[in-house]
């Protein structure tokens, strides 16, 4: 229901997934007093986005207003839910309290300062970020298995396995920005020397912008 609401109001069904992905680790760090936090890659640099942080291997969780408020798209999740309950028939009667929405909201600043948790670092500044090699590592060491079929909108079987919204998310981004999942994958693999530019172009023509099931 939240994903449908976010699609209708923001054009982004993936919104709640991103909120949880970004904020949940910080909540856990506060709970267990973990001061050193690593995310995987800075997607803004590895794929496409704002290059403002290209020389900074971390995000400042206290001072960076884009991190604090930007992901919320100007609307705290509780306000969005209140709007949905009042205006959307499919959300009528939904029971949702603050604790239900905790991990969709940024952590408390004062608690972060008190515990000395103020930054999250990106692994791609310390190790070469190679998505294909990351997959091989996980397959060898954690038993990760690829999908039997490729991910929608691209050719790989080991990326975009998070949930069933991925294909739809990348399709929406493709029709809005002309940037799909396949162009991200091919660009990285061309830079990593795994495929040629011509091979990448052929893959993009075949898979980028694929309508999801």
Can you name each region flagged by the protein language model?
Residues 1-213:
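Nucleotide-activated chemistry modules centered on ATP-dependent adenylation/adenylyltransferase
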């Amino acid at each position: 229901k939240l994903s449908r609401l976010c699609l209708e109001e923001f054009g982004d069904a993936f919104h709640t997934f991103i909120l949880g992905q970004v904020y949940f680790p910080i909540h856990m760090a506060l709970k267990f007093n973990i001061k050193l936090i690593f995310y995987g890659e800075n997607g803004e640099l590895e794929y496409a986005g704002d290059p403002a942080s290209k020389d900074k291997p971390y995000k400042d969780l206290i001072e960076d207003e884009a991190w604090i408020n930007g992901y919320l798209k100007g609307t705290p999740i509780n306000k969005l839910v209140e709007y949905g309950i009042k205006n959307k028939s499919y959300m009528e009667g939904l029971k949702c309290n603050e604790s239900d929405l905790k991990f969709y909201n940024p952590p408390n600043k004062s608690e972060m300062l008190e515990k000395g948790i103020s930054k999250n670092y990106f692994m791609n500044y310390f190790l070469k970020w190679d998505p294909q090699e990351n997959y091989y590592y996980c397959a060898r060491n954690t038993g990760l298995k690829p999908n039997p079929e490729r991910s929608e909108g691209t050719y790989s079987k080991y990326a975009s396995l998070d949930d069933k919204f991925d294909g739809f998310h990348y399709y929406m981004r493709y029709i809005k920005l002309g940037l799909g999942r396949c162009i991200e994958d091919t660009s990285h693999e061309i830079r990593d020397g795994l495929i040629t530019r011509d091979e990448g172009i052929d893959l993009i023509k075949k898979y980028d912008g694929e309508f999801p099931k």
